[in-house]
């Protein structure tokens, strides 16, 4: 996509924030209009996160206009909303490559630009990192300022409050901008969000603000003071807010789409000392009516036609996603068991739980972005005699590792972890690949871990884990569609038993997970035995011993880090039993895997059928 200077005459003048700061203030609204339109044109052609960026156009322009970036540090939380930031910081002409192999990173990324001071992707990290930068800036003594932008969903996480509590204690100069669009990926929950959403419409707030302005503006000597401290008058209306109790000077709420007023407010705040919190109200999807009306569906989008106002529908006959299979299993199980309790940390849509949340609202809990709480909450439900299911992405389960060990596994509580997005996720890059869950779960005592090879096996494993009441279980499945296999009635699988799918000679391919179709092709060409191992823990030790008697080579296959993964478990067993079998471990290498489509990444890593065959052939030479 070439940049059309005639269509975007003001944006054409702004390649970097230095050029932005040369513009007269009255041209900023025009710049925002063009920036929003350019974002729409670009993302509709390339796919990507969409609604969040539309809502932060004015904030992004105002921040770069007022603050001396990159000398001043601007820290974005999560990064979904940072597309306008990328466009204004030297990456305008490459924005159409975002989330693609070799293209712009989907989130702010330190290796990509000096304006991206923190690499992000997971939520609620900005204030902690920003506080560290603010302390470093104080020691440096050069007047560097630090600003953190965090959304109303991300600020509900415990880490954000830990950071604010610390900031209020040490009193470093730090600005936190709370971007309140009343809508994170799933609807926000909890008393804090209700409080924030009600502030702007309060009659007391509005009348006191206007009354205070009239009284003070009638005194000529302090007119300028009124301009500089109007924000403080707003803060006076809500004394004792949670933020002020944490030691922040709370200012707001203010209109996040009035770029000139926002720039004025930020300019005033730049000189304030100590921790400051600016609360802005924005509209997710601002400027594009379909996204404003349905910001959840338009949060992340495929390529689409902006004129149609609709997203492309799934292809007819497409196989169901694993997330949908999970949601259907939840429905089927809840219909028979009122003690099922399903828990998600703010990922209702992505985890396939929308219909379940509507049909079984009393058995559904969205705990917001609070993975640690989600796991320990599940532990409490299990203690109380209920049957909790924690639906969580692999990459986000990392955030609750201690809770899995301390609150669930040590107490041997029957909690089922439905781990979505295991393995290669694709376009979201390093922060979202599900590369480590088998490794970090396998070493936990009492944990049973299952890896389905297709959607029917996924259903059966969820059923098996749910009815296993002797301790915690995990079923780990990928992003994407199933294979089209027939769905059979639910029945419990024997724990720790694999299935031989093909009988061959010399080589036994031990598959863990959904790479089975690729392994099948390689096995046919190599005349290898193919085993669907099903269980990472416990391993089918009897089957491994049997195979070791008739095969000289084992090849373990998994879409997880090789280090510590399922293949490592096979190695450990063979060594412990002194079984003389050569082993090739195939999986994810010891690197953070960048963005690309799932197919591109698997091909690059040799995890497609041709790559698996090639790795085995080369190793056997």
UniProtKB/Swiss-Prot annotation:
Family: Belongs to the transketolase family. DXPS subfamily.
Catalytic reaction annotation: D-glyceraldehyde 3-phosphate + pyruvate + H(+) = 1-deoxy-D-xylulose 5-phosphate + CO2
Keyword list, A-Z: Isoprene biosynthesis, Magnesium, Metal-binding, Thiamine biosynthesis, Thiamine pyrophosphate, Transferase
EC id: 2.2.1.7
GO biological process, one term: thiamine biosynthetic process
Entry protein name: 1-deoxy-D-xylulose-5-phosphate synthase
Binding site for thiamine diphosphate: 80, 121-123, 153-154, 181, 288, 371
GO cellular component: cytosol
Cofactor (UniProt): Mg(2+); thiamine diphosphate
Pathway it works in: Metabolic intermediate biosynthesis; 1-deoxy-D-xylulose 5-phosphate biosynthesis; 1-deoxy-D-xylulose 5-phosphate from D-glyceraldehyde 3-phosphate and pyruvate: step 1/1
